[in-house]
């Protein structure tokens, strides 16, 4: 098979995969509880239109509370659309309002531990993430999505086995335009438990030191 034939075959397979993704996309319902936060984002977008070709950070409170983004990624055009307490399906549900309109060059996504804490299984969380990818890539097929691994935490240490299983499943995804950033091992101390100074007093949300650690893993993807 010639190089040209291989190129055409690769293009055909990519188009076929893209068509399959579109046909299997499922948009979850938009929960009213998040409407005030989403409307606040939309109001901000109207008064201060977000810049094009930005890096979009989206997900749960671990993204929303990342107030040092600009300092951690100097010179990078950023948008933060984290909303606290949300699960993966919530970001999918509101993707038409807080993801797709921005046409970001890169999406950095963190969510999943709220899902597990709510009683969902690793298989369910994995399914929600693959659906998120399907929905987003149906509209933005060449936008890379970086999944920050679900973190270990003091408050949810009992969920560590489910967290590790979920991370393992997501890390194995072979799709193009997907990356998995594994911050889990680096958040553990010599005794194998989460480092206390990487968390706020609630033992759940990241401290500034933790965000600096995360940034060191993510930064290479932004260049």
Regions found by a protein language model. Give the residues of each.
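Catalytic His-Asp segment of secreted/periplasmic serine-dependent ester chemistry enzymes
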Residues: 16, 154-223
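A short helix->loop->beta-strand "cap" motif at the edges of active sites that frequently abuts
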Residues: 140-144
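A secondary-structure boundary/capping signal
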Residues: 58-59, 112, 183
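Charged helix-capping and loop-helix junction motifs
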Residues: 122-132, 162-167
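Extracellular glycan-modifying ectodomains
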Residues: 48-50, 97, 114, 130, ...
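N-terminal secretory targeting modules
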Residues: 1-55, 63, 67, 71-72
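Conserved beta-strand elements of the Class I
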Residues: 56-58, 79
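Oxyanion-hole/transition-state-stabilizing segment in secreted/luminal serine hydrolases
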Residues: 63-79, 88-126, 146, 150-154
